[in-house]
Amino acid sequence: MASRMCEAIVAGMQGENRSRVGRGGVAVVLKHLAAQGEAVGGRNGQSAIIGTHDLHEIHLPPVVAGVRAGALGFMAAYNDIDSVPCCASPWLLQEYLRGELGFDGIVMADGLAVDRLVGMAGSIPASGRAALLAGVDVSLWDEGFASLERYADDEAVVAAVDRSLRRVLELKAMFGLLPEGYNAGCDRVPLGSNERIGVGRGSIALPKAEAITEAIAHTREESCTLAGECLTLLDGAEQWSRIGACLRDDQAGSIIVTGPFADDMACFLGDYTAPLEQTQITSVYRQLRERFGERVLLAVDGTGLDGADWLNAAAVVAVLGGTSERSYDSAFADNGAAAAVAEHGATCGEGVDLCDVTLPWRQDALLDRVRELTDAPLVSVVVSGRAHVLTHVLETSDATLWEGYAGQYGPQAVVDALVGETGMPGRLPVTLPAYAGAVPVRYNDRQSAEHVYRDAEEPEIGRAHV
């Protein structure tokens, strides 16, 4: 699946065989190279202790697919693989990536990853030298590359700088970013094509306004479709039709929307997302309110409503989970993490690691409170980018819907499913643990985790479907 996704994003942004490079396309830098998802303890940028077999069988096939698709860049990861940092690994960045796979683009390091080598290299300049000689062409935010003048008499460093500079200039030339007549040293031929891309054209081919308008409309349509395809019903199929009927029945009573994300949209968007216009912002609560008017009541933390509102409720929709929302002016640590995360800020995303994968902010307790207040059917909608323990949610709710990060049309997709207008065709992209201590659990574990723990007969709630 990861390999097919790599192929799709490269073809979509660069064109098949790089056909859109310099013609309105965007160069792709695939990340992260490699095995960053295997970090010890699930901690961002930590060591990946894996054998050669697992490295090649699990983590490198997407790299192969990306190179074959014509990706113009790769980003070396923060982590080390068996004690060798990825951005200081000549085997990974040169022998394997370029020598074995034939990659001809640029390699860049992740943010501050070069300077993180100081413990191994002994100094910031030495860190820059180690990364450069290993095969890193471009650094991000580092001081190490900016300190390479110290090695002006080092022939190996000078040769590596020339080599990396040529790669960067060739890439810029492919996109017409060099002055007219400038020659980067050689032309580049797109993979699978006999057409030569001129070097130093001094112009960028941009799509016409009509094409942009058409692409935006197509993207919105596809995004709406994908949001619906994210929906995965974890439990309560036998109750779903009855709940939908209660929602649609104007005489059935109020609809109460609760949970930390009841009136939130950012939770659907994932990590590193651009701000939305005010007119684009919606939520599950607002979508329900648009359809059913004043019947829909909001109680984010389970308070603020009269007891009669709860007793007369037709249904309760709890929007739970986590979020990758972070401030756009966040400072970042040397592992890419937001330096400060508010109490109700990001619980997922790059550098946002959790040692407790139960739902944050006492969301299980919120469901208990709701059950004390009403006997109305309770639907829990889980919006999350990580695998949380949902054991209590499943036990407490009449139905549980997993949504993941469905994008800006996520709230609409949830409500469409709630009222029975659409199906829920999704499949889990992750394996959900039944207990926090059962992690890691994987869909491709070679041995089943069933009946292994003395204190947990079944440590998994649901398995990924790939």
Which residues does each PLM region occupy?
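Glycoside hydrolase catalytic-domain context in secreted enzymes
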Residues: 1-463
